């Protein structure tokens, strides 16, 4: 089998540390699979690994895109697949690390993407959303694709527009397209290792603490620097949890403590969604940690799932 290990799990579950140690043990390099760590200048708010945390292990797909750029899962796979192939071609282990389940599935399982021709359809739908709001578009989506209409969050403008665009361009709903692609064999055979906690509250406590540490590490200054560099508050990158809330706070003179509580709440909700997504993958070997994790035990257990040697 290919020497690929995917370390997955919700935010603040310890993925970075495990990925680095596995890369060291199996002569590997880390391929980040995070939809926000791909942006430059956002290391604090996205919890991108520091040089110290990397421990000399080569990391890929971190800080490769401008924060003003719209970055999609298709673009990620386009850039990450050659990196993965290069790592393997040199006889090394590729340790994929990240909590963005869609990105990991698309890269390793080979989910194909619905065609996206440049006909102006997306721009037309975006203009409609700006003029009349997203609600009419969501209502149209529910008529043609009830499954997607029920699944997508009412404020997820980008995915609602994308789902409508796919139907209007191809005549096939995005739900049907996704069902077909899931029937295809995996593109890569990987060992999947999932990290979480025995008690969900322990994970939530770690998330709350992480947000507080981000503030201490200079998250607000990081956001100010992004805004000063000309990045629009409406940019996709600035809609990330931990940025949107503080951008609103900084630009509107809001209360930092209230914004912090909101970031913590949304981060906990996001972790719950991450777990829901990942638990659909029956290939994942889950390691559930106690409140005070024993990393040595976690590492030993992870190694038992890896059938190849460095």
Regions found by a protein language model. Name each.
Residues 1-310:
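Phosphate/pyrophosphate-binding catalytic cores of soluble transferases and nucleic-acid-acting enzymes
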């Amino acid at each position: 089998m290919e020497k690929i290990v995917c370390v997955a799990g919700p935010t603040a579950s310890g993925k970075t540390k495990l990925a680095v140690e596995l890369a060291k043990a199996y002569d590997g390099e880390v391929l980040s699979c995070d939809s926000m760590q791909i942006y430059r200048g956002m290391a604090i708010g996205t919890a991108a690994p520091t040089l110290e945390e990397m421990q000399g292990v080569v990391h890929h797909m971190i800080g490769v895109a401008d924060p003003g750029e719209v970055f999609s899962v298709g673009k990620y796979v386009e850039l990450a697949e050659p990196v993965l192939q290069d790592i393997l071609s040199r006889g090394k282990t590729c340790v994929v690390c990240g909590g963005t389940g869609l990105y990991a599935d698309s890269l390793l399982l080979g989910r194909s993407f619905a065609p996206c021709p440049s006909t102006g359809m997306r721009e037309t739908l975006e203009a409609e959303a700006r003029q009349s709001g997203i609600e009419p578009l969501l209502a149209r989506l529910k008529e043609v694709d009830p499954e997607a209409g029920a699944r997508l969050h009412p404020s997820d403008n980008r995915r609602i527009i994308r789902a409508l665009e796919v139907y209007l361009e191809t005549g096939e709903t995005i739900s049907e397209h996704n069902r077909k692609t899931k029937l295809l064999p995996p593109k890569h055979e990987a060992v999947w290792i999932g990290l979480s906690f025995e008690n969900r509250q322990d994970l939530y406590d770690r998330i709350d603490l992480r947000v507080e540490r981000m503030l201490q590490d200079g998250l607000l200054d990081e956001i100010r620097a992004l805004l000063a560099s000309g990045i629009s508050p409406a940019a996709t990158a600035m809609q990330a949890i931990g940025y949107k809330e503080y951008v609103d706070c900084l630009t509107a003179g809001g209360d930092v403590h209230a914004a912090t509580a909101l970031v913590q709440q949304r981060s906990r909700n996001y972790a719950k969604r991450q777990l829901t997504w990942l638990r659909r993958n029956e290939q994942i070997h889950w390691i559930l940690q106690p409140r005070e994790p024993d990393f040595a035990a976690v590492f030993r257990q992870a190694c038992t799932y890896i059938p190849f040697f460095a």
